[in-house]
Structure formats: structure tokens, C-alpha cells
Curated annotation (Swiss-Prot):
Entry's free-text remark on domains: Gag polyprotein: Late-budding domains (L domains) are short sequence motifs essential for viral particle release. They can occur individually or in close proximity within structural proteins. They interacts with sorting cellular proteins of the multivesicular body (MVB) pathway. Most of these proteins are class E vacuolar protein sorting factors belonging to ESCRT-I, ESCRT-II or ESCRT-III complexes. Matrix protein p15 contains one L domain: a PPXY motif which binds to the WW domains of the ubiquitin ligase NEDD4.
Keywords attached to this entry: Capsid protein, DNA integration, DNA recombination, DNA-binding, Endonuclease, Host-virus interaction, Hydrolase, Lipoprotein, Magnesium, Metal-binding, Multifunctional enzyme, Myristate, Nuclease, Nucleotidyltransferase, Phosphoprotein, Repeat, RNA-directed DNA polymerase, Transferase, Viral budding, Viral budding via the host ESCRT complexes, Viral genome integration, Viral matrix protein, Viral nucleoprotein, Viral release from host cell, Virion, Virus entry into host cell, Zinc, Zinc-finger
Domain RNase H type-1: 996-1126
Superkingdom of the source species: Viruses
Annotated protein name in UniProt: Gag-Pro-Pol polyprotein
Cited SMART domains: ZnF_C2HC (SM00343)
Gene: pol
GO cellular component: viral nucleocapsid
Amino acid sequence: MGNSPSYNPPAGISPSDWLNLLQSAQRLNPRPSPSDFTDLKNYIHWFHKTQKKPWTFTSGGPTSCPPGRFGRVPLVLATLNEVLSNEGGAPGASAPEEQPPPYDPPAILPIISEGNRNRHRAWALRELQDIKKEIENKAPGSQVWIQTLRLAILQADPTPADLEQLCQYIASPVDQTAHMTSLTAAIAAAEAANTLQGFNPKTGTLTQQSAQPNAGDLRSQYQNLWLQAGKNLPTRPSAPWSTIVQGPAESSVEFVNRLQISLADNLPDGVPKEPIIDSLSYANANRECQQILQGRGPVAAVGQKLQACAQWAPKNKQPALLVHTPGPKMPGPRQPAPKRPPPGPCYRCLKEGHWARDCPTKATGPPPGPCPICKDPSHWKRDCPTLKSKNKLIEGGLSAPQTITPITDSLSEAELECLLSIPLARSRPSVAVYLSGPWLQPSQNQALMLVDTGAENTVLPQNWLVRDYPRIPAAVLGAGGVSRNRYNWLQGPLTLALKPEGPFITIPKILVDTSDKWQILGRDVPSRLQASISIPEEVRPPVVGVLDTPPSHIGLEHLPPPPEVPQFPLNLERLQALQDLVHRSLEAGYISPWDGPGNNPVFPVRKPNGAWRFVHDLRATNALTKPIPALSPGPPDLTAIPTHPPHIICLDLKDAFFQIPVEDRFRFYLSFTLPSPGGLQPHRRFAWRVLPQGFINSPALFERALQEPLRQVSAAFSQSLLVSYMDDILYASPTEEQRSQCYQALAARLRDLGFQVASEKTSQTPSPVPFLGQMVHEQIVTYQSLPTLQISSPISLHQLQAVLGDLQWVSRGTPTTRRPLQLLYSSLKRHHDPRAIIQLSPEQLQGIAELRQALSHNARSRYNEQEPLLAYVHLTRAGSTLVLFQKGAQFPLAYFQTPLTDNQASPWGLLLLLGCQYLQTQALSSYAKPILKYYHNLPKTSLDNWIQSSEDPRVQELLQLWPQISSQGIQPPGPWKTLITRAEVFLTPQFSPDPIPAALCLFSDGATGRGAYCLWKDHLLDFQAVPAPESAQKGELAGLLAGLAAAPPEPVNIWVDSKYLYSLLRTLVLGAWLQPDPVPSYALLYKSLLRHPAIVVGHVRSHSSASHPIASLNNYVDQLLPLETPEQWHKLTHCNSRALSRWPNPRISAWDPRSPATLCETCQKLNPTGGGKMRTIQRGWAPNHIWQADITHYKYKQFTYALHVFVDTYSGATHASAKRGLTTQTTIEGLLEAIVHLGRPKKLNTDQGANYTSKTFVRFCQQFGVSLSHHVPYNPTSSGLDERTNGLLKLLLSKYHLDEPHLPMTQALSRALWTHNQINLLPILKTRWELHHSPPLAVISEGGETPKGSDKLFLYLLPGQNNRRWLGPLPALVEASGGALLATDPPVWVPWRLLKAFKCLKNDGPEDAHNRSSDG
């Protein structure tokens, strides 16, 4: 409400005086702010506290406010004093509003000028709520009511449309009608008297002109008229009916009867009372009834409210009916219905035997005026003889809103009998009428009209009338508001009858619907006929077996907006079936009529037996629901029922879900619409009163409701075993007597809770007991039905899926391997259309025959508590078959079929481990007992090779189970032997963990689009490059396959540099199954490996320049896959321009501005724009003399890697490893990897990090003979080399991941180290790797002969001198790992870091500007 505070007065002032002060504050200039209203409230508190009395105008004048303390409050008091002085003095003392006469109403300050007008703004919902809250306890039309609205209007300057919206929000329908009538009359009178300033009749009505943006004073005049119309509202606090409220124990019927009596006695003639009853039946109802009526709304018809509150009423009360059910017609004159006795004591004298209207204590004074019906001043309206005679005819029927002259005097008894009752069906409230008149179409003399007792006038569609019928526009107030352009008044009478033979009545005023949507028979027709409407009483039987308390938590407590999913159309057959199903649910009390929001579609589904099943599609509601976790993970395994308690009985609960009631606040989400055939009648809406099937939380809520009674009965019979799942319950008892007692106690307990036990489904031993689709025998468990598998080729995809679903259900008792099932599963691939036709192969048909034979032996033994659990793992190429059994049992406990792993190759040892773990989980969950022994069909040599040679970390898990694992050779007794009808062949090449001397060596490598291999045995036998598709990994696989095809069938040592290919080869040679439909290249690789009697698989680090033969041959294979251009070389490695200078053709200068290193976009984006100064650090005098170590971090995708970097201070050779964790163990692992590739250092210099200073790391360095020292971190004079190396490596990684976002971290780091160590050239035109592996310094004696010089020239700096000018060039006499011996006099050894190769004088320049790449 803008800057206005709450209209509720603070302590110490009456409401009228507070409103006077607020209105005076509106005249302040500038306009009042929130601080002004706060000062005004503080002033009232101060006055009440200091003066010890309430504030009034006489006691709180302008002088009562201390100056300067309460802001502009003195100006407000002065304004109030000025206005009241001009109006003739101060008002009198205010009296409370609720006090009745003879007290005078409180004096209110007259409407004053509002000063400067506020800018117009539309109402916000929060403002409308605040206004309604302020006036909800004030009488409509009262002075305080008007004053409150006046202050709200001053704040927003509303247009006529805004005022109409305000009226609809704060007023009841009857008040809205009265206000609109009074406002229309006031506007017409003002326009006729020409008292409106600025009004021009030629430009439109006052409503139209005041809605313009520049209306100004004209809008103020409209607002004043709107407020003046509010003073004439019919309801006043003094009206007797406004003070009638429903008692806490009073039924809704008695409360409505009291309202009707009060309105009949006191309401003026001509004022409709139905809207007042509709409004007050909700507003003055008690809290419990208001909660029931919240979904229907406060302005719903009173009949709907009484039906909704019928259950709340006491049981000895009769439900209220505004209509009566006609009885059988009797000959002779019609007798009035007997007077019904009162249902309870009179609320006036609290005595029984008479109605409240006949109470002797009721005041019987003379009436204040003549009777409005017969104009007789001697009696009240309720005692009018005319009304009593009319009531005798109507007998409790529909009351007319206006006085109508009786027409029964001219009718015979037979005609009167026809008029007295209009029978209507509850589901179809329509009646046939016969019309005649000059304005009707000739074909519209008979029609079907909808009876609506809420409509005051009859409504006809416009297409029933001729085109030029006389009309007058009409404004109609309906449920959606005021409609001004849709309806017209028909200016001419029409004749109407309910039977062809009459009698006919004349209707003078009829509404015409121009949209041709409605044909309604209003209250005017039954009133003129003096007839009643008879509707058969709705039969609502109680819900049999509903729990006392509904669940308070069903997952919808957050009360989201209910879904509005439209009902889709149905054909006539399904619609009739749906109507029958809804009718049955309605009779059973599971559903009830619904008028609130929300909708989910419904449809029927035909069962196999021809019956129909009701389906409610609650997917939209389930999407809004928070799932409640179920108490049971799934159906129990019936083999877990031990054989010891032999006496079993099972029972089933009938319509179990329908016994759980649902609170009314959740019924919005469980509603649906029943469509009418052809849409000729209004649809009907219903909502569930109980938990429906299809609701996501219905199973969990039902389990929670049944959990406690089952626990109580189970505790009382502790020797019996209870098994339950949803509405199926089974009891196993040691004796027959205890079984009978347990059943009686459980059935009685369930009936007390309201559940129905289906006696026809109760069964017990000695006959087999059906339970959860299975049959429980004395020793075994079978399935009630087995699939027949009458399958022929071709077959549709839908039929094959159904067959596989049936097989999955009975698979735990079917003695078969995974192979025939896998054949059927493979036929489902690449088919998505359910109508697709599948051709089965002969092998698949043979698998179906095997399954059909296995189904004939489908059975499982029950668990014997005295015997241990044993397990068998049967490995096949299609998957694993797992068997859980006990010794001496006829059948196993269960069969389990598991597929291969998701990888291309599934190792046999891993499959055995996964099978054992799965069986252990099933044994513990079903029988709460671990497995004693595992048996398998895997060859012992293959299992030993996998355990000894596999690098899989899960080998440790299999070693923990090793004492319990036994091979198949022991042949233990058990039903699993039926599986060994065909022994599985385990083919694997002989694996050798160590290289085979004098054997053939195969090296392979790959690049994008090609692969290569070479064969070597004492000398190079064969080498070749072959084309390959797509990636480098597939290229290396193609090279390996070509090499294996070219190699003779003899032992071979295979060396690859791909980690993936290395892992795949080791998996295959150690024993593994490929996928049932393997990649052709993998299948060919497996067959090629089987050609060789012995195989060794080795991994060589890619791009290694080590001097051993393996690295040399691997480099030879790399040379078979050269890159064609220097641009491709730089795109792969992002090397510096010096490295490109080694490219043979074309030659590229290191300082060429057109070099690929200079033109590369990635390098231009990521290269630093400048470099820091080189600092002096402690360097080694030889390779592996002093190392520096550091840990840096690099983020790739969602992981942050710790890079453990080790740098040789002499050569700059670097090794780095990426680790996920940052522990001392990972640091030691990184150091070991660096020692493997670079050698062992003598000294290691690190920072003072926790990983390097830990006792474990220090002890490790001592054991390896490495001297450990520390430096200050991030210090350029002590840690500059490793910090610079960290930056170079991370720069290269960033470039690679910018070009290839999905490049694995290991490959990116390997490429970065290769580029940094072996490709990028230092200023001396040597790589770091060459410098690290160059020969040591030659020993030259002092008196020896000076070596001869070479052709190489070098520029040099002398060590220890401050002059940074390059000297030379001079030839190098000797080149060694530490430096070069220059031909000075005498010769001087100069380290490589102070040397620079000299090529041409004209090229000597600032080379750093041209070498900004990954190695500055």
C-alpha cells in the first residue's frame, strides 16, 4: 500500500481517530514518507505513556506534541485541527464498532482533499491482500470501511478497472451486485444532473473517460462516486444474519437453517438471499468446516458445501438436502409432507422438542412495519398466511428470489401434480423444455436445457433466435467476474412448458448468450411454476476398512502446484468401460466428486480374461513427489524359508492400497476427469479418497501402515516365521496348532484395522502353497507357470522381449548356462521398432531348444539350516553361470546368470572374483550366512598365471578368498554337475614373464592414418609401414597385426609403446574372453597370438633416446612414420624454432619470422610476452650430480593433478609424473620413476614442503644414497630452475589440451616431456637429452699435446667476469658433456651454458625475440 502503514491502530487511540490522523498525513507536502508514519505512531505511544489516557482530538491538539521530537507530526495535528474547525468542531468520542444501537456510530473525519495526486499504478497482489486484511473485521459500507478504502485509493489513484478488481477481491458476490447497481445509478444521476466537472458526453461514458491517463479530476469524481456507492451495501453489522456463526459442535445443516430463518424474517423483499447464504455459510462456519471447504471456495453453492461437510456432522444428525426425493404417486389430493422433528435441542433455550424458530423465548414484539408479502401490519413476514400456503405447496423446495402471484388456483390436481416436482439425475442435471414465441427459430420449439439453481435468469443461445430479435446490452455478474459485452436482454416474452400438453408460463425477461455456449434454465422458471427440484440422494457407502489415521507424510508436503494434464479422448467401448469402473469405485467409496484444481488422465486396460482394469496415469504427480524409500528391497527369496517349520499358511489382503485414506490437502494431485460421450454433457470430475495404484509412494506407505501390526503379531509368536511383501503374508509354524492360533490372531488384528482378508486366496500345507507367483512345497520351491517357448522364426521384437522377460522371471530355477540366453539377447541389438521382425539363426533356435529342455527341470530346494552353503562358478565365452547349493539337496538354491565385463576383454581371474563376490552378497542378503566353499571350472595354471603376473589391483581381493576356492577336479556332490554337458575350452598362448633369449622381437608403432612394425632377430629381418584408419592407437594395432602375420609361428617378444595396447595384450595372453560380438581387429589379434607357442609382452616408453637396443629398435620404428611437413611436427609437439632448424627439407632458420613456431596461433595465445632474468643457482658439474625437485599443480577437466617434477641442474633433463593424490608415498613413487629414466642423483635439492621433510622420504633418500638438502621456496636464486621448468611443462600441457581437449593426461605429459627433453634445442644447439647422455669430459694432461681444432665455432663468455659481451668466435678443440675446450692461449674449458654456436656474422642478433615458444 505504498507509504501507508497498517490501518490497525496502535495502543492508545481508537480506530476512527487513527484513520483521521492518517488521512491528515496524506495532505503533507511533500508526500508523507515511511518515517513520517513511524513518527506518528511513536507520538501516540509517547502520549499514551505520559498522559495515562487515550489520544483524542480534544486532549491531543497541536500543542500536545513537543516541537522537534516527532518530525512533522505537529503539521499533521495542525491540518486535522484546521479541517475539523471548518467542518464545525471536533467529532465526538469514538465508540467500538461492535456495539449495537442505541450507541451512535463512531464519528469519522469527512473526506478531505488529497493534495497532490499520486501517480497511477495497478494493484499488486500484496496490496490487495493488505486491504482485505484491514477491512475483514469491518462491516461493508460502514464509515471505517469507507475511510480505509479512501486511504488506499489515495495511494494508487486507481482506474475504474482497478476499482472493479478491488471490489471483486474484497467483497462477496451479493455485495458486488449491490455495489454495481448503486454505482450505475449514481453515475447515471450525476451525468443527468450535469454535475461532473470536465465530463464530455460526446467522448464516451464516465467510466471510459476516467480510465484515460490524463483524466485528472474526472477520475477523482469517479472514485468518490465509487466510495459513495459502498455506503449502500445491503449487509450491515446490525443485520441479524451477519452475527450468526456456527458453533463448535453444531452441524452445518443446523447452521444453514438458522441463516435461512434469519434471512426470511429480516431480509427486505426483493433482495436475493441465496448469495448471502453462499457467502456466510463459509465465512461464519467453524474452523473445521472451513478447512473442509477450502478446496471448494467460499462462494460455492450451499448444496455443495453441505455435501462436503456431511461427514463432519454428528452421526445422529441427518444430512441437509435443499431438494427432496419424490415418493410414489398416490391417488387423491396431494398431502403436505409431515413436519420433520428437530434433530437436536433448540439453540435458544437448550430444550428439545421444538425448532428454534418456534421457541417460546423468542421475542414476539409487534413488527416494525407491514408484511412485505401481503402488506398486513399485524404480523411478521414469517407468519404470513400467503407464505405458509406457498410453503405447503413447495414443501421445502427452492425458494424464489422475488414475489410471484400463485397460479395454482387455475390448475387441476393432475396438472398441479405435474408441476410440483422436476426430477433430475445427479449426473445429468438437465430437463427437456418446450418453447414458443415470435422470436424463436422454427426448429427450436423443443430443447434440452441445463438446470442451474445458481442462475437468477434463464439463458438462451443466440442461434436459437431470429437474427433481428429486440435486444438490450446487459452486464452480468458471474463466477468469472462482470461480463459486459457477451449477454443481451431479449425484449419480448417467451412461453415455456415442461410438458408438451402444458401448462405454459410466460417469462418476461430472458438473457441471450451471444457466444452460443449456454442454454440454462434459471431460478425464474421453477419460481413461476412454484415447483421444487427433486434430486435422488447420493448413495455414498462408507469405505470398508479404512485406517483411522491417514499418513501425514506422502511426499507432497511441499504442496507444489497440482498438475493439469488434459484427459485424452477415448472410443465408445473404452468410455463405457471407464464409466462402469468409475461407478464401482464411487459405490465402494474409493473416490468422490471433486471441484478443485488438478487433473491426471485415466483410461481402461483390458485384462487377458476380458475384464477391464482401471488405470490412472499419475506420472505428472509422481514427478512432483519426493520418493519415500521402501522398507523392503524387493520380493523375498522363498528358498530362504527353512524346511524346519513345516506348517505354512498364506493369506492375501483384498484391495489393500484402498484401505489407506488420503488427507484432503493431497487430493488435488489425485484427481481425474470422466469425459462424457461425444462431449454432449458436462464432464464429471473425481478425486481419490484413498491411496491409488500408480502413485509412486503407495507401496512404501502401505508397508509402513502394515509394519507395526505385523511386528506385534510376530513378537507374540516368536517361534513362527513371518514373510511379507506388500499385501501377501506367509506364516511358517512348527506345529499345526500354533499355525491356527497365529492365523486367527493375525486375521483379527488386520480386521480391527479395517483390512479385508481374501478367504478364497488363503491356502495352507500339506498342499503346495501359492505365494508371490511361486509354489512352496515341503522341500522345494517351483514357479506357478513356466514359459512354453513355442518360438519359430521369424518373430517380432515385442514377442521376443516378452519371452525374455518370462525367462528372466524363472531364471533362478532353470539349470542352464549363459550361452543360450546370450544368443537371444544378441538378436535384440540394432532393433528399436517394436514391430520389427527378427530372423533367428539355426544356432539361436538350437539355444531355444536347450532352454525348453532346461525348463522341464525348473525347481529349487528350500534352505536347510544344518548344512553349509556351497557355490560353483561356471565360466563361458558368453558369461558366467553362478550356482548356490547345499550338499545332499536334490536341487540348488538358485542359479544366477551374469554377463561379461564392459571391457573388450574380460580376464578369467577377474570373472571368477566377480562371481564369488556376487554369490557372497546373495548368500548374506537371502540366508544371512557366508559361503563355505567356492568351486570353478578355470584351469589351475591359467588362474596361477593371472595371480602372479596380472597388474590388476583386485588380485589382492582374490587372494583373500583363496583358502575357500577349490578347482573343479575335487568333484563335490551337487546339482551343478548338470551344467557340465559340454566342457569349455580355455585357449591361451604360453606366457613368459621374462624376455625369451634368442627369440624373435616384434616392435610396432602407429600414427594417425598409418602403422609400422619391424622384426628383429640378431639382425633386422623385416620392416614395413601399413595404412590404418583414424587414430594412432588403431594405427599401432594395425602395425602389430601386420607384424604378427609376417612373423613365423615361433616364440616372440612383443614390444609396444602404447599403454592401452600393452594392457590388452597382457590381458589376452594371461587368459580372457572377448565380447560375444568382438571388434574384428581384436578377434584377429587373439587368433594371431594363439599361433605362437610362447609370448612375452613388454612396454617401452615412447620417444626414448636411451642407448639400449630396445629403445634403438623402437626409435627405428618411429622413423618409419615420419611427419611430412614442419607444420605438422610443430602442431604435434609445439617445439621451439631452434628444433625446427634441424628439419632437413626445407631448411628453416631459427630466426626465420615465417617459422611455424612463430606463426602458430596456439603459441601466440599462450606464450608469455616476456621472460624473467636468469639467476645464479647451484648447478652440478656432471649429469646426475645435483637435482632439483618440486611439486606443481595442473587442473584438467574436473581433476587437479599433482605434477612431481625432477630436474637435473647440469643438463636440464626433466622427468615429471602426474598423481591424483599428494602424499609422501606418491612423492617416493615419482622419485623412483625419475631414477629409472634419468639415473640416480648424488644430491637432491627440494623446498621445505611436508612431503620432502617427512621422516619416510628422508629415510628413503638415505637408503638410496641420495644426499637431501632444502632451499627457500619461490626464491629465484635457489629454486629458479625448477620453477622455470614447471612453467614450461604446464605451458606445453595447456597448448596440447587447447588443440585436443580430450587428450588423456598421461599422453599429454609424455608428449610434453618428449618435446622438452628430446626435441627443443638449447642455445648451444643441443637437446637436454643429448646433453644428459653426452660423454664425460676428456682428461688432458698439462704437458700433453693440444688437440687439433674442429670446424665448429663458438662465441663464449669467461666465467667469473662481469663483462657480458660475447667473445670469439673460436674453434672447439674438444667437446664433452660439461663443456668445450676452446683454442685460446692457453686453451680454456668453458661450460656449455656460457657457449653459443656461431654460424654467420650477419645472423648474430637478438635471437630471443624469434625463439619465443615453449622453451624461451
